[in-house]
């Protein structure tokens, strides 16, 4: 008996498809409250931009040059984070992203690690800017060299 061929549209979960093809959060904020960037060994880069008010994450936008799986993961991080408190943001993990997507291919779990890593970098950047608010006017968002760290994410 022949092995069933994978049908992208029928075999992926609705959550995966919505996150992979949703681009409503795909944007760069000019003056983010927090910014993080990570590049994986696969070459994909994810940049995360946070809008936080009174300790609540109002919006999370992102930019990526990555594959459809990286887009799905970055979009999922944004979806899971919006409306949470800053402290609750740290509870978002690669496993929670994978669980939400349901059908992220196992060979692409590093995409979830990459997206969450960029999000954690943005949370840490927000925390730093809260301690040293004088730095915010000098933050360059997507050109911020301090966030341009290479991740050790494998293909």
Q: Which role does the model predict for each range below?
A:
Residues 1-30, 35, 58, 84-88, ...:
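C-terminal binding/interaction regions
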Residues 29, 39-43:
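A short catalytic or substrate-binding loop motif that flags glycine-/basic-rich loops and adjacent residues
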Residues 44-54:
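Short beta-strand elements
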Residues 52, 62-64:
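Hydrophobic residues in beta-strands and at strand termini
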Residues 56-61, 71:
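Short small-residue beta-strand/loop micro-motif enriched in glycine and branched aliphatics
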Residues 64-73, 111:
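Short, thiol/selenol-centered motifs that function as redox-active sites or metal-ligating centers
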Residues 69-84:
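Alpha-helical support elements that line or immediately flank enzyme active sites
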């Amino acid at each position: 008996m022949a092995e069933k061929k994978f049908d992208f549209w029928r075999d992926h979960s609705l959550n995966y498809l919505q996150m992979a093809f949703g681009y409503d959060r795909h944007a760069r904020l000019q003056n983010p409250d927090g910014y993080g960037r990570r590049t994986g060994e696969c070459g994909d880069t994810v940049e995360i931009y946070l809008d936080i008010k009174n300790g609540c994450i109002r919006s999370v936008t992102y930019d990526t040059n990555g594959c459809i799986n990286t887009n799905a993961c970055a979009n999922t991080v944004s979806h899971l984070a919006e409306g949470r408190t800053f402290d609750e943001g740290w509870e978002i993990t690669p496993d929670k992203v994978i669980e939400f997507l349901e059908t992220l291919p196992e060979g692409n779990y590093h995409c979830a690690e990459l997206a969450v890593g960029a999000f954690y970098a943005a949370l840490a950047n927000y925390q730093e800017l809260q301690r040293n608010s004088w730095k915010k006017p000098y933050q360059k968002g997507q050109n911020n060299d301090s966030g341009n760290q290479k991740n050790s994410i494998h293909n």
